[in-house]
Amino acid sequence: MLLGAAVGDAMGWPYERRDRTRSLPPLSQVSGRFFAWQRMASSRFRPILEDIGPGEYSDDTQMLIAVARARLTAGDDWLTWLQRVEWPFLLDYERGAGASVKRACRAWEKHESAWGKRADDQEKYFSAGANGAAMRIAPHVIVHHEGSFGDLAADVIRDAVTTHGHPRALLGALVHAYALWISLRQPAPLAYGWLIEAALDGLKDWREPVWQSLDRHWLDAAAKALPGGYEQAWDDTVQEVEDLLTSARSSLDSGALSAPSAFLEEHGLTRTKTRGSGTLCAVAAIYLAARSAAGPERGIGIPARQEGADTDTLASMTASLLGAGLGQEWLGSFGRTVQDSALIIRLAENLLCPVSTTLVLPSRDEADQARSRFLEELDRADTRASLLLPDRRQARIVARGPMTSGNWTAQRTHLATADGQNLFLIRKVQRAEAESVHEVPRSEAAPTAGQRASRLPTEARLQGAYLPVTDISRVTEALTALGLSAPRRGSDWVSYENLVIRQAHTRERATGVPRVQLRVAIADVQVAWERLRGMAFDGAVQRDGGAFWVQIDPYLIVAVNNAEPPVG
């Protein structure tokens, strides 16, 4: 279920238009595998292009992992851990979080509630009806998989209100949780349309106003937030969801005459103002999963590439439902190559039987100090340095380098945690310093032939080496998996500092031994080997596991070692 959510997220993220910077490769070139792409990071006022590796996930999965970690780390105190540790820390590494989520995280960072005290803060909070709550609630479902839905619903609501206040967000989370919960209890295979019927049958359970048991401060704020009162808004939203589910059932009853894209477009899943609605996404995911149980691969491919949709979240929620009902074998190579797959599988297993040993909850001051200390150490640490994260995990710096995009520069740091999560932090975003430009004196403007000849030896500069490959997309995926980032790229080339890899003009495959060997030093050879083998490259381990080689292109072998100088 968690792995399916991550796969759907990673499949859909490149197709989300607000993050995409350029056209993507044709589907025929990337069918059946993840691919590298570029997104616009930072903000629209300070845009920075970021390279995204094959199978990397967005904030959807980051928050899902944060919720799972809070439950496993703090036990019964998971909610306080989420507010005090996870949400402030998310601001440092999030990849595409929505405005409502980031606004709430900043409030918890300042030890304030997400709903605030000022009227404008409360208006923004109780207007937040997006899918940011629904996308992350799967860990609660696993914890309560054998319990009552009432207990699950209470935890889902307590989690959801840490970032969102509108009934559409809360009911979206509850409906999605119910669909996951009931799917876990239904033996496979799932009948066509069964999940929609189950969701309608469960109306009496997920419609319950469990928000009425929340903190008094929240209830007081909610009572004044919406015209007609919160209870009326809740009932109206319940009716919206019931109508949507009924429409979804009618669409499925039409069978082959109904196209899933038509349903999504008709109900606002492709319109900018409504595509991120919590209730719309929850019902759309149920609809897509209900019609795709016999072909789950297609079930996540449709939302992942639906033009105009919130593709990463919709595909993630759909895939999590299919995972809950069908397991994870159908994910195939996607499940093996999605970012942090081993960690995600382990989190799901641990949530089934949580351990009784938990960490002591930090005080607010202790949590603040831990995060401040981490950021200070991060900024002055060298590559390969070890760091203690605010959530008390150990991590090491895998790579660090500058990012330049237009008039802006930044520094990106890639961290690998001891438990197997990869984090990418973009810091020090600032306007690039303009190069000094001055008018050249006339006496210097036209050097003589003799002057040019005498200056050549000192001014000559090696720009780099060009390497042709038969499949530049596949080669880029492999190098990204090794932690190498490309600061510049064109339509048929990618630049790794002084090495430029270029798509060969001919698509004929090379014969015999590859012409070039690229040597890469990396700290964790075993992890790199497993990652590349999971991508189906040929190769072999050498030096008792301290090195290996893989053929990533007919023209190119990559030799990887553990940072020791090669012999000979």
Report the location of each language-model feature:
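Short glycine/proline-centered loop/turn elements that form peptide/ligand docking sites
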Residues: R474, G490-V494
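Short, ordered beta-strand-loop transition motifs
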Residues: M403-W408, P487-S491, Q542-G545
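N-terminal beta-strand motif that seeds the catalytic metal site of vicinal oxygen chelate
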Residues: Q451-T476, V516-L518, E564-G568
